[in-house]
A protein has these predicted regions:
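N-terminal helix-turn-helix DNA-binding core of bacterial DNA-binding proteins
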Residues: 1-31, 51
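Histidine kinase transmitter module recognition
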Residues: 4-7, 48, 66, 70-73
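Conserved anionic group-binding/transfer micro-motifs
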Residues: 15, 63, 74
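Basic amphipathic alpha-helical segments that dock to polyanions
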Residues: 32-34, 38-39
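Beta-hairpin "wing" of winged helix-turn-helix
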Residues: 40-52, 58
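Basic, amphipathic "hinge/linker" alpha-helix immediately C-terminal to the N-terminal HTH DNA-binding motif
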Residues: 52-71
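Amphipathic alpha-helical dimerization/coiled-coil segments
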Residues: 68-90
Length: 90
């Protein structure tokens, strides 16, 4: 969800569709709102003023920092995995 919100503010439906498109994961309403509640509690996202009964969310600076750390770690692990697979092919 942080990856989705890094691309701009989104309300729940737009967030669900975006995550489904780039990650292939369908988030149910319970899962979505529980995750948003945790992210908001941890100050990684903030809820903005409602627009036409839709409540958009925005990633915070702290959320961007956490996302950058997670992406760097994922990149490091992917690189290590590819290196080890190449060694195993020899």
């Amino acid at each position: 969800m942080l990856t989705s919100l890094a691309g701009g503010d989104k309300h729940a439906y737009a967030l669900t569709k975006d995550v489904q498109e780039f990650a292939g994961v369908t988030l149910g309403p319970g899962t979505l709102y529980a995750a948003l509640t945790r992210l908001e509690r941890d100050e990684l996202v903030e809820r903005l003023e409602a627009e036409d009964r839709r409540c958009p969310y925005r990633i915070t600076q702290r959320g961007r920092e956490v996302l950058a750390q997670r992406l760097a770690e994922s990149s490091r692990l992917a690189s290590l995995g590819l290196q080890r697979m190449a060694l195993g092919d020899k």
